[in-house]
Every structure is written in structure tokens, then in C-alpha cells.
Swiss-Prot record:
Family matches, as CDD domains: UDG-F1-like
GO (cellular component) term, any one: cytoplasm
Source domain of life: Bacteria
Alphabetical list of Pfam families matching this protein: UDG
Record protein name field: Uracil-DNA glycosylase
Active site: 65
Family according to the record: Belongs to the uracil-DNA glycosylase (UDG) superfamily. UNG family.
Compartments reported by the entry: Cytoplasm
InterPro entries: UDG_fam1, Ura-DNA_Glyclase_AS, Uracil-DNA_glycosylase-like, Uracil-DNA_glycosylase-like_sf
Length: 225
């Protein structure tokens, strides 16, 4: 999996593609893609970084690993491709958005509109074998995505990090720059959403911070397709 980045992430992450962990990961992925069904498609692996450049990143919403069902994953955390049923966690995200802003719940889970406005939808692991959650955990992606977080941490311009659930909150140790903002709650999963995700108002908190910085707020409304 060579460096296919086309924006300002390319020079920042180029050294990672030469490191031993990444070369090992790349060999593993070449084998996996040739012998199993793996998501997302190879050309979509780095979509989070392609849609949201380093300089344009305002918000990071950290996910875990990609959806492992057919036609779901396309390289953005929580997002699914058009024409696919909205997964339960994303549906709860939409319910919270409806409660905050009054937006109708859309008929799709395609979050590219957020990514294009500076919301980096980053999973900590970027690939998965079909039907096997966490099957690519511990293969090297964590080193790579930790570096993405570290690079954003080095920025002077503030970033708002959204850490939902224990897995995302484990990355808080990488966010040491006091310029940045962290918004935490339990995960929007149906297992935990009622224990503190619903009512946490993350979207309006983000926009309040952006407005106070003089930045354009995020238009969170996802249109019907």
C-alpha cells in the first residue's frame, strides 16, 4: 500500500511509508487483499486524509476499525456508502443532531459533506476482513494513525478532538498541546448511548468553539440522497 496521498498530508506522512512497521503492514495487506474480501476497497483506504487536508482539519472524530459488511466502508469513520442502511451508532449520532438542531434524520449515512468541511473522520485501523471485526488490529495501522494524531497535535492552530468511548479516549495521551480542545463522552453505540452520549450536545459545542476562534462553523445537516 504505497503513499497515494495527494495533499499536504503527503510530505508529512511520507516517512511513515518507509518505516519497517509500514512495510510489514503493506506486505500483510497485499496478502489479505489477494486471499480474502477486505474493506474498504484499496483506493478508499486513505479517504479520510484525502477529503480532509492537514491544514483544513478543524475537527477529528475518531473511530475504531471500518465497517465489515458489504458496500459499507469507504474510508471515513462512521460513514457508509450511499444506498446502505445507516448503522446503529450513526443513527444515534443523527438522533443527537436532531435533538440539538432539529435536523431531520437523513435517508443515508454518507458523511462526505462533513469531511469536506474539515471534519477528519479517522479510524485508528484503516482496513478489516469481511465479517471479522478487529481482524486487522495490531498489524501496524495504529502506529500510522497515531502519527496522524501526533502531527495534528503539533499544529499551532487548534483542533477539536472528539473522543467517544474508551477506545478513542485511549488516544488522549497523544494530545498534549494545550491549544487543542477535547470533547469526550461514551460511544454513540446502542449499548452505551443512553449513558451519556444522548444530551451531550457535541455538535453545538464544536460550533461554539469554532465561532469563538473566528472559524466557519460546520453545517452538520446531511442531505437526503
Amino acid at each position: 500500500m504505497e503513499n497515494v496521498l495527494k495533499n499536504d498530508w503527503e510530505p508529512l506522512l511520507a516517512p511513515e511509508f518507509e518505516k519497517e512497521y509500514y512495510l510489514t503492514l503493506s506486505s500483510f495487506l497485499t496478502e489479505e487483499y489477494s486471499t480474502h474480501v477486505v474493506y474498504p476497497k484499496v483506493e478508499d483506504i486513505f479517504n479520510a486524509l484525502q477529503y480532509t487536508s492537514y491544514e483544513n482539519t478543524k475537527v477529528v472524530i475518531l473511530g475504531q476499525d471500518p465497517y465489515h459488511g458489504p458496500n459499507q466502508a469507504h474510508g471515513l469513520s462512521f460513514s457508509v456508502q450511499p444506498g446502505v442502511k445507516t448503522p446503529p451508532s450513526l443513527l444515534n449520532m443523527y438522533k443527537e443532531l436532531r435533538d440539538e438542531y432539529g435536523y431531520e434524520i437523513p435517508n443515508n449515512g454518507y458523511l462526505v459533506k462533513w469531511a469536506e468541511q474539515g471534519v477528519l473522520l479517522l479510524n485508528t485501523v484503516l482496513t478489516v476482513r469481511q465479517g471479522e471485526a478487529n481482524s486487522h488490529k495490531g498489524k501496524g495501522w495504529e502506529h500510522f494513525t497515531d502519527r496522524v494524531i501526533e502531527l495534528l497535535n503539533e499544529r499551532e492552530k487548534p483542533v477539536i478532538f472528539i473522543l467517544w468511548g474508551r477506545h478513542a479516549q485511549a488516544k488522549k495521551k497523544l494530545i498534549t498541546n494545550p491549544n487543542h480542545h477535547i470533547i469526550e463522552s461514551v460511544h454513540p453505540s446502542p449499548l452505551s448511548a443512553r449513558r451519556g452520549f444522548f444530551g451531550s450536545k457535541p455538535y453545538s459545542k464544536i460550533n461554539t468553539i469554532l465561532a469563538n476562534m473566528g472559524e466557519r462553523e460546520i453545517d452538520w445537516e446531511i442531505p437526503n440522497l
